Regions:
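Beta-strand-rich domains and repeat architectures in extracellular enzymes and scaffolds
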Residues: 38-68, 187, 193-194
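Beta-propeller blade signature
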Residues: 117-143, 217-236, 240, 292-314, ...
Length: 389
């Protein structure tokens, strides 16, 4: 007969093993930014150029927007899955750690850029114009060529204010013009605190695209919208590109302006960095000679908006104006501060502890690619970022 003590010991071991196996798996810990790969090569794709990046350091995935396609890859650059079939312009991306999803800007319009995308996609005729925040359920992206419309991986929320500004005709100081504030749509997208605060709830923040018309004065501000997305599930719906819905909030929770001088197509990439408590705006070079035409600007999160009239904009009253950060190079003629930094307009992502991933776009055999490099913020006037090697 088996010794009773041995039986008791075996039973205790079985209970311990069952209890251990029944425990939920521990969540993966985010990788310290300094230990992340110094370089991630996205590979090349037969699409438009890379528009933005988003990083999930906990689950160790990186996401790229290639104009009409979303790419999910691991941190070595190996592609896990793609979402295709878009005939609009998929711009910047941001990862929301609160719900584990990737948010992006999506534009449908019949201007030169929109027509080019439609032609490249084989779409005949025009399309209903509209602007959407698209939300990707990235856990479901498990293979390449998943359909944005049919595979249940993407929902969309309509942003009515941007469409209204895009389609508006206004009376400027130079006469009647289309596109209020020069609005060409929107590109930059990120989560951060309400302007004027460094903590609290995170608001989805969108930045306008702005046409680079040098003959008007109402397009010299960056325009930023903030939304509280905690109740956005009621608006989310799949997007049929043949019959696009109009589900979305009536207005943003805040509209803000930053005077930078005109930049071609506004803010290309927008990100908020918790370590420095700043918003960063990466832009294309502007064409107006009276401005310094920096390619990187910053706004301190603690800077409170001030109700002010907008210079060169006669058709609105006093608006919420945010000052630029007092870091960077100051242009003595205008007081505008910023940096001449050559990268960031195709991807700028804060990942913690003053580290950033920044896209270096390239073309190879007529295909578009990006080498995404790890940088550390220095704050210096001449070299705001240093590459980590």
């Amino acid at each position: 007969m088996m010794n009773r003590n041995l039986l008791r010991a075996a039973a205790a071991m079985a209970v311990t093993l069952f209890t251990f196996l029944a425990q939920p798996a521990a969540a993966a810990e985010p990788v310290p930014p300094a230990q992340l790969p110094r370089l991630i090569d996205s590979g090349t794709f037969p699409t438009g150029h890379i528009q933005g990046i988003a990083v999930d350091t906990e689950h160790r995935y990186i996401y790229y927007s290639y104009t009409t396609m979303l790419v999910k890859a691991d941190m070595q650059g190996r592609v896990v899955g793609t979402v295709t079939g878009l005939v609009g312009h998929l711009g910047s991306l941001t990862f929301n750690a609160e719900d584990g999803r990737v948010y992006g800007s999506l534009e449908y319009k019949n201007d030169a850029i929109g027509r080019g995308i439609l032609a490249a996609s084989g779409h005949e005729g025009e399309i209903n114009e509209g602007f959407y925040v698209v939300i990707f359920d990235v856990d479901r992206i498990t293979r390449t060529d998943m359909s944005a419309e049919r595979d249940g991986v993407m929902t969309a929320v309509f942003i009515g204010d941007i469409l209204r500004d895009y389609t508006a005709t206004v009376r400027t100081e130079q006469g009647e013009r289309q596109h209020r504030f020069g609005c060409s749509g929107f590109d930059g997208i990120t989560f951060g605190p309400r302007f004027g605060r460094t903590g609290g709830h995170r608001y989805l923040t969108l930045s306008y695209g702005i046409y680079d018309d040098t003959t008007r004065t109402d397009n010299d501000y960056q325009v930023l919208l903030q939304y509280d997305t905690r109740r956005w599930r009621r608006y989310e719906a799949p997007l049929s590109q043949s019959a696009m819905h109009r589900n979305g909030p009536e207005h943003p929770d805040g509209r803000y302006f930053v005077f930078t001088g005109n930049t071609a197509y506004g803010v290309q990439n927008l990100c908020y960095d918790d370590a420095t408590k700043r918003w960063y705006m990466a832009v294309y070079y502007g064409q107006k000679p009276q401005y310094p035409n920096y390619t990187l600007f910053a706004v301190d999160a603690a800077s409170r908006p001030v109700k002010s009239a907008l210079r060169g904009v006669p058709y609105v009253g006093r608006e919420n104006v945010l000052p630029l950060s007092d870091t960077g190079v100051e242009d003595k003629a205008t007081g505008i501060r910023g940096w001449h930094f050559p990268y960031g307009s195709t991807g700028l992502c804060a990942i913690g502890d003053v580290y950033f991933y920044i896209s270096h776009h390239y073309v190879e055999n007529k295909r578009q690619g990006s080498r995404i490099r790890l940088y550390r913020w220095t704050g210096s006037a001449e070299h705001p970022f240093e590459q980590v090697r």
